């Protein structure tokens, strides 16, 4: 019995270590799957409602643009600083671009880094843990002149990649917003790193249709904010299809965790092998003594 207990403990430690190593990878894959399901469901709902004539998209767009016109110029807060706020969002705001009543406005697609992420109303913790959020107080992502919408998401979460590779975008790259029955295309024209409370780059500019993707930086430190701004350009499907995917320098979150898993398993296997050889050597020594 005394010989069995250490072996059981070693096995338990091995499983615990393996679980810790695999958690980020498995969790990220699960969240990616969930995001794909949500996006697929959203697209299906849009198609079904369009075919059945169940919804007046013109009225939806008009309501969103009317909301944007009524927005007063104001200093926007840091989205991550207000994520835990308990205040309920404005009812008018929540009713706009809310196709299924679940708060999902649509989704953002970034061909360069090969991601599609659902976009929800608000930047509350429960939103940012699983998807991207629209910063209330900024323009709704409905297009039009003199608007500036802000879409925020975390970077480097163990459970989801989200905007982890946002820093790989360059000026001239494109990102898309799939909102209701339309696709809004934006070309990156400005990338900046600012202090969390420096939000002047998020202000509306007269006549311009702008969207900024916002996340924390540097990776793992999160002391500043990375702003990737784009201006509206015509959507051309051929251009998007020709955009190179995942042509990024450095190691992505998925690859990084996979590397750590391989290294961790190799070290664990080596440890078990050495332990086995040590135990075998001890048994041989005892056997040799008994034979003498």
Spans of model-derived segments:
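Generic N-terminal leader/processing signal
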Residues: 1, 5, 285-287
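Solvent-exposed, non-transmembrane regions of membrane-associated and secreted proteins
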Residues: 3-253
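C-terminal single-pass membrane-anchor helix
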Residues: 245-292
């Amino acid at each position: 019995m005394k010989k069995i207990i250490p072996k059981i403990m070693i096995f338990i430690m091995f499983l615990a270590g393996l679980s810790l190593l695999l958690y980020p990878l498995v969790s990220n894959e699960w969240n990616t799957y969930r995001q794909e399901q949500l996006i697929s469901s959203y697209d299906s709902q849009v198609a079904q409602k369009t075919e059945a004539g169940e919804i007046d998209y013109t009225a939806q767009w008009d309501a969103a643009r009317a909301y944007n016109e009524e927005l007063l110029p104001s200093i926007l807060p840091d989205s991550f600083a207000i994520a835990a706020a308990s205040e309920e969002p404005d009812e008018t705001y929540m009713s706009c671009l809310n196709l299924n009543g679940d708060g999902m406005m649509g989704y953002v697609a970034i061909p360069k880094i090969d991601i599609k992420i659902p976009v929800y109303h608000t930047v509350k913790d429960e939103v940012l843990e699983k998807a991207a959020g629209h910063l209330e107080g900024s323009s709704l992502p409905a297009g039009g002149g003199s608007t500036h919408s802000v879409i925020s998401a975390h970077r480097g979460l163990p459970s989801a990649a989200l905007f982890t590779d946002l820093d790989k975008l360059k000026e001239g790259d494109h990102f898309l917003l799939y909102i209701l029955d339309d696709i809004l295309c934006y070309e990156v024209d400005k990338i900046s790193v600012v202090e969390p409370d420096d939000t002047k780059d998020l202000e509306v500019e007269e006549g311009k249709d702008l969207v900024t993707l916002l996340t924390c930086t540097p990776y793992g430190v999160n002391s500043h904010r990375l702003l990737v701004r784009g201006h509206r350009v015509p959507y051309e499907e051929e251009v998007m299809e020709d955009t190179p995917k995942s042509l990024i320098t450095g190691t992505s979150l998925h690859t990084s965790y996979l590397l750590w898993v391989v290294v961790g398993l190799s070290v664990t296997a080596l440890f078990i092998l050495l332990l086995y050889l040590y135990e075998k050597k001890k048994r041989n020594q005892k056997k040799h003594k008994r034979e003498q």
